Swiss-Prot record:
Effect on the protein of changing residue 609 to G: In LQT2; uncertain significance
Mutation effect (residue 920 to Q): In LQT2; uncertain significance
Gene name per UniProt: KCNH2
Full protein name: Voltage-gated inwardly rectifying potassium channel KCNH2
Effect of residue 1153 to Y: In LQT2; uncertain significance
Source organism (scientific name): Homo sapiens
Record note on what altering residue 903 to R does: In LQT2; uncertain significance
Positions of region (cNMP-binding domain): 742-842
Connected disease: Long QT syndrome 2: A heart disorder characterized by a prolonged QT interval on the ECG and polymorphic ventricular arrhythmias. They cause syncope and sudden death in response to exercise or emotional stress, and can present with a sentinel event of sudden cardiac death in infancy. Deafness is often associated with long QT syndrome type 2.
Amino acid sequence: MPVRRGHVAPQNTFLDTIIRKFEGQSRKFIIANARVENCAVIYCNDGFCELCGYSRAEVMQRPCTCDFLHGPRTQRRAAAQIAQALLGAEERKVEIAFYRKDGSCFLCLVDVVPVKNEDGAVIMFILNFEVVMEKDMVGSPAHDTNHRGPPTSWLAPGRAKTFRLKLPALLALTARESSVRSGGAGGAGAPGAVVVDVDLTPAAPSSESLALDEVTAMDNHVAGLGPAEERRALVGPGSPPRSAPGQLPSPRAHSLNPDASGSSCSLARTRSRESCASVRRASSADDIEAMRAGVLPPPPRHASTGAMHPLRSGLLNSTSDSDLVRYRTISKIPQITLNFVDLKGDPFLASPTSDREIIAPKIKERTHNVTEKVTQVLSLGADVLPEYKLQAPRIHRWTILHYSPFKAVWDWLILLLVIYTAVFTPYSAAFLLKETEEGPPATECGYACQPLAVVDLIVDIMFIVDILINFRTTYVNANEEVVSHPGRIAVHYFKGWFLIDMVAAIPFDLLIFGSGSEELIGLLKTARLLRLVRVARKLDRYSEYGAAVLFLLMCTFALIAHWLACIWYAIGNMEQPHMDSRIGWLHNLGDQIGKPYNSSGLGGPSIKDKYVTALYFTFSSLTSVGFGNVSPNTNSEKIFSICVMLIGSLMYASIFGNVSAIIQRLYSGTARYHTQMLRVREFIRFHQIPNPLRQRLEEYFQHAWSYTNGIDMNAVLKGFPECLQADICLHLNRSLLQHCKPFRGATKGCLRALAMKFKTTHAPPGDTLVHAGDLLTALYFISRGSIEILRGDVVVAILGKNDIFGEPLNLYARPGKSNGDVRALTYCDLHKIHRDDLLEVLDMYPEFSDHFWSSLEITFNLRDTNMIPGSPGSTELEGGFSRQRKRKLSFRRRTDKDTEQPGEVSALGPGRAGAGPSSRGRPGGPWGESPSSGPSSPESSEDEGPGRSSSPLRLVPFSSPRPPGEPPGGEPLMEDCEKSSDTCNPLSGAFSGVSNIFSFWGDSRGRQYQELPRCPAPTPSLLNIPLSSPGRRPRGDVESRLDALQRQLNRLETRLSADMATVLQLLQRQMTLVPPAYSAVTTPGPGPTSTSPLLPVSPLPTLTLDSLSQVSQFMACEELPPGAPELPQEGPTRRLSLPGQLGALTSQPLHRHGSDPGS
């Protein structure tokens, strides 16, 4: 296999880095997007969920100011500081009191930290929460002077709020008040100054707090000013009188909506119950002066909403140095503004009190770097905060990538040096040491007499350099990440091959030089053979090619023979001087070649003769082909020969006897890899895939192959029985099924069935899993990595491990479309299950179904509620059987949650097309049909809604709120029916279409809408009559008609049993079968027996017509399915009007309902 490169594709490791830094510190934090409205929360960790008691699904997309944690003791000043911190680009800490979901209060230290992208702009905020103390331990609220008063939900009518702001810096400015006020007319407002404009009630003065403009809010008090005494006490003598607050222009409105010059929005001194909190800048120096004095500046005499006062405009646009110097001290004032403005006049600025938005104007460019203080606070180490972008793995300076070309060349060089060491180290230790002792000393001729010593010295130097390079070479950890940190590389190398490499690189001949013990040097030199371990650990890199495998096998055989030849010569050389009888193999060799040893032991064959003869003996012994010309004679030689024969037989049998088997075994996975890779490259070449896409394709294939090792799990599982397959799938998905809350409590059989349906998906960084507009056919569970969800270019959520995304399958009978793109930030592993498979399993285990849907919390709902899935082209996406099964399942699993979600249609009643904007004001419905006619297709009538059932519904009084004078829409009214009821037949409708009485409540045109987004009124749970265009009938008239219809239906129920009994009697006595209306067989004439049963029924039509006078009118207006043929306008009709006499009924066959294909 190729070199394991690890995860080298650019990844967005923002979430992983934050979690890794915080996981050991018990941090509680959320991440918010600074580029969306309200700085919505896009991620929260488990610690924050445990702290506040809310689940992750409840926190996502909420404002990061945590308004849902506010309570009676939450300080307004602290909340305003958090809001202002979100406007800037610097870190800030705020201490604030929050409330958990259970109502308990705690004091929390919030640390707001900005996060930048590659351009240096702040795109996100990290809010870290640290619990200081539980609020229950604090004293009574009377001592909490900075705590916020009760909100609207806890505040009794007429009770005002108290807001005291600690501004000690204002005390130092009192001495300069006159100078600043004198220059207020021509100066400019300080850039950092703000105005505090709040509703206050009189409170006890404090040495450190400043009561600002305390007034009482009254709903019917237009002026909004408190008593004159209070104003004089606050403003002081000499202050100019205030004019009506309605004359004060709103600079905030102009800054937010420059085009709305004609807006009538103005600042008000009082705060009504519908007003909202906002943040605004100071518009002039007068505002700053008034803030110091505790009042607002006097408004201009001629205020205009179309343009600002010239003086204000001049002050805003002034940038002179004198103005900045004049007000340099005002920047010390905390930048906090609470401006309660009555915005009811401008719908663009209107906001409900329950959802307080933070409107963040551009104060300054958010390009400040994260300070070192932030790094220390969050304990992020040297990495500071990661940037939110796709970035390649960070490589430290002077670090070598383990897959770089330089490293590859260096490894080949080291391999050659290792081979040299493996060959010459045993040779020099066995053959050359004796010659060195007999030759001249090295001190006289130096390295000129020993050329191999120079080479050995160079090899030792290269090995030492290789050790240094290994300290700077990256590696791949267990998480498939490339590690480039020098410290971690050193620790990894110390734990691995450092000891072996160090021992093999020690130059023992230099350390023991001059000691005279050449035998010891020769033995220590054999430690260099440990370098062969480097070759052994890299053999798998070259074992995928057949030629390389054969070459390595032959080299291994020759190297072992070389080592054995050196040992064979060492044995004979050791025994030769001490042997009296000349029987050793060296003596025999000398006698054979004519170079015998003399009596002193000198002479004999040359080194070349000795080595070649020894190598010849070992090869012949290893291959079991001994010719006997070189034979062992001494006991030592014979024992060694036995060992060589054993080794030879083992090598011969295992290598040469099974070369083909070894190659096939080594090539089994490699051959499949290259075959598949060849197919991929042929596909790329044939379709001319562009370069970037080609690289992504090859990179994914290589990583997927290394991830699965080329194993096709489906092919492997197919060879096992289903019970074993279920056990294997249960083991592979055990982490998800054991730790995911919705699967807890499921039986073993249910878990096995679910495990069989799950599929594992592996996604590289940058890969898009779901595109905007794609059908949501599966539910995804993240098991590793992190993903981001984008709407356009805006990140709306970041999901990590154990998060779930998709759509709530139990609320919709048909798959919806995605409202955003889902893109992987890192290498991700996801478990997905298709909606059909999940619904099928839950259908088999209905006792587990309710628990699953109630405990399933989808972290992010991808369903696009702004689109209408029930379009004509979407009918072909599902088969008839799956539609019926999904409709049945959706009915059985309906919950009351449908009525609580605006924009979703109730799943219990068949008529769920509410009077939304999409169905109102357009004649003819969504497909251009008239209100009183226009057929619709049977497919759309069956499964257009989230839940559709053919079973009759029990009728309940209609209580959905409707505008006055607006009748129920979707069905024509009675006078419309009278105008177009030429073909209406009450009798045939009563007999052959009793179900039409109930289908009146479920309009076919209403079922074309699966959901209505942003519906202002909740949808009824059981009965939802669609609303038509407004102004056609008053509400009282419609309700009276509904009551009359209810009474008629009650009468019908009393006669239904008798009528059905009569019909059954007619069918039983009919002797001949009546063919279908669309059949080619002619209907035989009625026999004489067919007229007698009809005589007793003569009074029945009259009674039925009387009892169904109004019902028939509604039935006549009901639309036919689009697949049914239209009724003929001329000629005989199948539905007889029967204007009072029943004689014709005896000669006419029974007719079918209008929905029958032949009617």
